[in-house]
């Protein structure tokens, strides 16, 4: 009985630890995908990237519809003494066939009313069909200890799977005002709605007689909402344009609606029906400087800062400390892009982005990990008619690997096994986008 209890507890801890971190999506318009640095834009995509700048648009009604298709892989190369192959690869896939967004601007004289709807955060949907290292290592260590080292990994099978879904839908509305020929301001807000699901199971069976050692399940929906106040400023002088935007921190709590929970009053208490977990959207500051070198050539340099350390997050596993305190600093992003008008109909563009997180071992986990990255965007715009423009782009991200080594003497050891182990986290990301801008 002691053996079954230890194994079951290990599985429950592994499942209850599944609570992925939030991602803030800045790639709302296809113009971002093809140029990346759009914080000084004076076109309709500025509704999101430079809302004060829309006050410099010509009078009229504008509408934009965009669609993106994103595909990610999330790999974990785990090294653990009880793995027969020593190092085992766990591959997760995250695919979103369509990420839609829509923009509208009505500009009249010095005033501009603008709105936007889209997916402003979340990690899409991810599935680890073969489970995670935190599952397998805990199960193996539990069996090994409970059997007094008489049951080895070749004597049983483990069948586990984990999947999660996270989306934050946003609806933004605001007003821009042109103070004079150089300066405009913006004030507005965005309503954010979180929708997520986390599910997983783990079954351990002896090979000799197929006896089930444990069978654990979790199926939990999570929802929540919050309001993001937004302010902006734009300064335009000749060939120069400077755009500034600040999004305040969004106080966001997500509530569980649980369908299946093997231990709602025990290790899976965090996923008990009705429980709330903090998942704030961090404040965001963007500053961009654009310059028009020639009537055909334009370029922008930009900086983003996400104040992650002051955004409430779920606790570090095994502690009562929020994960935000484990970060060494907020997220810094450096962006640059340029576009060139080939002729009156065709524009080509490209851009780069460097993202630097303040990562640490306590922040990283199998179910929520990030990696510093470089991104490249390529694409163009085609003026199909005097009123209709098509944007098309390809966006690719190259992630640095993150190595997390855990000694047996550290808090609980590797995945609470009291043994040592190492995880190497890596990711890939590819996005294709197509959008249409129309002026009535």
Q: What are the language-model segments listed below?
A:
Residues 1-19:
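Gram-negative bacterial Sec-dependent N-terminal signal peptides
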């Amino acid at each position: 009985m002691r053996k079954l209890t230890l194994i079951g507890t290990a599985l429950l801890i592994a499942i209850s630890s599944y609570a992925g971190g939030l991602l803030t999506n800045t790639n709302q318009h296809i113009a971002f995908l093809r140029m990346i640095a759009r914080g000084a834009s004076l076109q309709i995509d500025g509704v999101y990237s430079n809302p004060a700048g829309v006050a410099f648009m010509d009078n009229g009604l504008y509408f934009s519809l965009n669609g993106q298709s994103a595909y990610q892989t999330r790999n974990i190369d785990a090294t653990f003494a009880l793995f027969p192959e020593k190092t085992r690869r766990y591959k997760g896939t995250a695919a979103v066939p369509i990420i839609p967004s829509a923009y509208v601007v009505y500009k009249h004289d010095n005033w501009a009313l603008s709105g936007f709807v889209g997916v402003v955060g979340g990690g899409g949907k991810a599935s680890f069909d073969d489970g995670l290292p935190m599952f397998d290592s805990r199960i193996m260590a539990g069996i090994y200890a409970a059997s007094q080292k008489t049951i080895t990994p070749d004597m049983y099978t483990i069948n586990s799977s984990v999947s999660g879904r996270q989306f934050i839908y946003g609806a933004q509305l605001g007003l821009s005002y042109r103070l004079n020929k150089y300066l405009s301001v913006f004030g507005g807000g965005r309503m954010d709605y979180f929708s997520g699901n986390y599910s997983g199971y783990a079954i351990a069976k002896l090979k000799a007689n197929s006896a089930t050692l444990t069978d654990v399940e979790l199926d939990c929906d999570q929802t929540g909402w919050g309001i993001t106040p937004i302010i902006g400023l734009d300064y335009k002088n000749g060939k120069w344009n400077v755009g500034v935007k600040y999004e305040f921190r969004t106080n966001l709590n997500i509530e569980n609606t649980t369908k299946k929970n093997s231990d709602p009053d025990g290790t899976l208490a965090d996923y008990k029906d009705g429980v709330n977990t903090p998942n704030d959207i961090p404040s965001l500051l963007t500053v961009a400087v654009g310059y028009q070198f020639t009537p055909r050539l334009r370029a922008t340099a930009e900086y983003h800062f996400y104040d992650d350390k002051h955004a409430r997050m779920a606790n570090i596993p095994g502690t009562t400390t929020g994960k935000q305190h484990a970060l060494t600093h907020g997220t810094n992003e450096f962006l640059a892009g340029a576009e060139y008008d080939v002729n009156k109909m065709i524009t080509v563009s490209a851009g780069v982005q460097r993202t630097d997180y303040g990562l640490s071992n306590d922040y990283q986990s199998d179910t929520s990990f990030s990696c510093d990255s470089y991104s490249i965007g390529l694409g163009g715009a085609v003026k199909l008619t005097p009123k209709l423009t098509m944007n098309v782009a390809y966006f690719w991200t190259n992630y640095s690997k993150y190595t997390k080594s855990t000694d047996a003497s550290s808090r609980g050891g590797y995945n609470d096994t009291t043994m040592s182990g190492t995880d190497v986290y890596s990711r890939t990301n590819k996005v294709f986008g197509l959008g249409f801008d129309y002026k009535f």
